[in-house]
Design a protein with these regions (language model features):
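Residue-level detector of alpha-helical secondary structure
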Residues: 52, 103, 219, 264, ...
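Catalytic core of nucleotide-sugar-dependent glycosyltransferases
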Residues: 189-195, 202-229, 242, 249, ...
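Membrane-interface aromatic/basic loop that binds lipid-linked glycans or pyrophosphate carriers
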Residues: 253-313
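Nucleotide-sugar donor-binding/catalytic module of glycosyltransferases
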Residues: 1-217
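Residue-level recognition of alpha-helix termini/interfacial anchor residues
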Residues: 51, 55, 227-231, 295-298
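Structural motif
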Residues: 224-235, 280-288
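Amphipathic alpha-helical repeat scaffolds of TPR domains
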Residues: 233-246
Length: 313
């Protein structure tokens, strides 16, 4: 079989049909859609059963006890038959030609991974475009597993880390350490719903500190493949830029203060001389300003700048 698409499902009855419609309508041939119900308490299973009955052999339904996104994806990978593996979140949807175009790009360029652009759709109608061609280093592209297609032989026995946030960063980055054969497609084939109640919007949760666990683990893998220099970028991008900013955007509280302090101390340990870091100096001026402010405990100024820029759009 050419392609396996893995779809973890939990509390998405409102969006699931749109997701599955976009998958069963793919123009690629010889593929399967593995739909893993991760113990969802809503009516998602009824929708899965309906699609499995309408598309026998194409939809592969699975049910498991709730264990989180990583465990659902890992189960899907364990049974996948495809030469290539793709992941789609069950509240998102994709262009009908996405996987056909990705497979063509991989085969044309003899690549192990293909990327495409993404669009995020927010509840207020805002649409944010993510252009993967804006970055020269693959590690700088969005860490989402969902706008990518992976060669199964590259994945090997790699899995998503159970029980942690930033599972995509862990999984994708480890694969990027193993190959530089990447095909890039400048089309927004992947469209995501950004819901107010989604996991990563929990700005005050201590799970934000999972980023430290993930980066420490990635550092071990980086050493195996001679990619130690990439760890600095991960700290810059995922702690000094996005991590601290996400927590700082929440309401003031003791928990928020402690989360930011822990992240900042970790960044300072990894980057004791920030402005001398080649990774830092290679960033754009805008990103360097925000990173510098957050490094020095001035995240309130960062928030003012970011909010002012957002209002001007």
């Amino acid at each position: 079989m050419k392609l396996s698409i893995i779809v973890p499902v939990y509390n998405v009855e409102k969006y699931l049909a749109q997701c599955l419609d976009s998958l069963v309508g793919q123009t690629v041939e010889d593929y399967e859609i593995i739909v893993v119900n991760d113990g969802s308490p809503d009516n998602s299973q009824r929708i899965i059963d309906d699609y499995a009955a309408r598309y026998p052999g194409l939809i592969v339904p699975m049910i498991k006890e709730n264990g989180g996104l990583s465990s659902a994806r890992n189960l899907g990978m364990n049974v996948a038959k495809g030469e290539f593996i793709g992941f789609v979140d069950s509240d998102d949807w994709i262009d009908e030609t996405m996987y056909e175009k990705m497979l063509e790009a991989i085969e044309r360029e003899n690549a192990d991974i293909a990327y495409c652009d993404m669009e995020d759709y927010y509840d207020d109608g805002t649409v944010v475009y993510h252009d993967v061609t804006n970055f020269t280093d693959p590690l700088m592209v969005t860490c989402s597993a969902c706008n990518k297609l992976f060669r199964r032989s590259l994945i090997g026995d790699a899995q998503f880390p159970a029980g942690l946030w930033y599972e995509d960063l862990s999984f994708v980055t480890k694969l990027l350490f193993k190959t530089d054969r990447i095909a890039v497609i400048h089309e927004p084939f992947y469209r995501g719903h950004c819901r107010a109640g989604s996991i990563m919007n929990s700005v005050a949760s201590k799970k934000n500190l999972d980023i430290i666990t993930v980066i420490d683990d990635l550092e071990k893998t980086a050493q195996q493949f001679g990619k130690e220099d990439k760890i600095e970028y991960l700290v810059l991008s995922h702690i000094l830029l996005t991590g601290i900013n996400r927590v700082a955007a929440g309401e003031k509280s003791t928990d928020r203060t402690e989360l930011i302090k822990t992240m900042r101390e970790y960044a300072r340990k990894k980057l004791p001389k920030l402005t001398q870091s080649e990774s830092f100096r290679s960033e754009s001026t805008k990103r360097r300003v925000i990173m510098f402010l957050n490094y020095h405990g001035l995240e309130s100024v960062s928030q003012f700048i970011l909010k002012t820029k957002a209002k001007m759009r």
